[in-house]
Amino acid sequence: MVALDKETVAVCLLDDDPSVLRATCRLLDSVGWKVNAFTDPTKFLEHAATHCPDVAIIDILMPDMNGLEVQARLRRVSPATRVVMLTAKDDPSVRRMAMTAGASAFFIKGVESSEFLAGVKATADSLN
């Protein structure tokens, strides 16, 4: 399998915490990923419906719409988008629900940068 060029893979990030959003964007940018970042689930879904990102990195605990609901709605508007969940809550039942609903990876915030980046890369590579 040939890895996709980071420049050609569309990545979207959704997290309601602006500081986490900035830090995650910086991390992805540091290795060449270009990211569209959102704090609002509705705006994220509107963007996904028109741009169909290759990979979506989604927080689970958000006030207006939780990440599992975003994941379900994303499947309807952009079914080919691969999902990576990134959350502060390590809950096995939530992990199971996300993975059963089609998430490619599930990470707890604070994960080692190299592990997270490897997971995003593996998710992008699965597009081939």
Model-flagged regions — what are they?
Residues L21, P63, D91:
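The feature encodes the CheY-like receiver
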Residues E46, L68-P79:
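Short amphipathic alpha-helix used as the core "switch/output" element in two-component signaling
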Residues D59, T87:
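Active-site residues of response regulator receiver
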Residues T39-D40, N66-E69:
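Acidic catalytic/metal-coordinating carboxylates
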Residues A37-V55:
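Acidic, metal-coordinating helix/loop segments flanking the phosphotransfer/catalytic sites
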Residues M1-C12, P18-S19, C25, S114-N128:
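Non-catalytic signal-transmission and effector/linker regions of two-component phosphorelay proteins
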Residues E69, D90-A105, V111-S114:
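Alpha4 helix (beta4-alpha4-beta5 surface) of REC/receiver domains from two-component response regulators
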Residues P18-N36:
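Two-component/phosphorelay signaling modules centered on CheY-like receiver
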